[in-house]
Amino acid sequence: MGITERLIEDVGIRRGVSRLTPEKIEKIVNAVLKGETGARLKTYAETCMRCGLCAEACHFALSHPGDPSYTPAGKVHQTMSVLLDKKGRVDPDFVYGMAQLAYTECNLCRRCVHLCPIGIDTAYIMSTVRRICHKLGVTPQYMQDTAHSHASTFNQMWVKDDEWTDSLIWQEDEAREEFPGLRIPLDKEGADIYYSVIAPEPKFRTQLIYQAAAIMHMAGVDWTMPAQTGWDNSDMCMFSGDFEMMGRLKRQHFESAQKLKVKRIVMGECGHAFRSVYDTGNR
């Protein structure tokens, strides 16, 4: 079964596809392939042996045994390989299926890379497919809404500055019942540690801030948290393919820490945010 046999409806993808023309698709695909990629993509495209070892690492493939279209190599075959072979001359219906596959059937986790005998980075290839989809204006609705929040507030949950500081003060008060001398220092210059979190913490899981503050307090750490934008280290734009906004987010994050002259940044739990901070968004 290929992607065309399992299409699902998404208003964001559908709306974006409805505005496409073959000429626009060809222009943007080739602009990305020629202007934003190079020998790396070409090497991956030409060296895959279709051995199938990558399938053993992919949770999508393991969830659909016997269907090669879910394997990492199969996903590349249905998307990037077609774009390269046809030099971007594909129709809007193809783009719909390509977007669904790239956004909903690959997590960019890179587990497949570790089993590939020649080290093909399928996540990089699929990330490039997402980049093309973003520049075409074809992104899943929920993901794009989150990216809009990043663009407007520099966090993914539409948290305003006063709501952020109120959450920190609230958790400091809560924690003092257990740790009377506990403080959550805001905008402290020269601290050893600048602690950053993801936006769902002040929005939904404020107790995680409490718990982190308790650890810092008991460890006697010299630390601080920012009172202004830059505190959210998450990055949905990395997932959507909006690399321009991704760069703005990371710049805001690092400049916030530099402004306070801290020695190091310590992050709360979030795998994608860590990748964005130390790797992708830092390029």
Where are these regions (language model features)?
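Iron-sulfur-cluster electron-transfer modules
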Residues: 16-20, 36-38, 42-45, 80-281
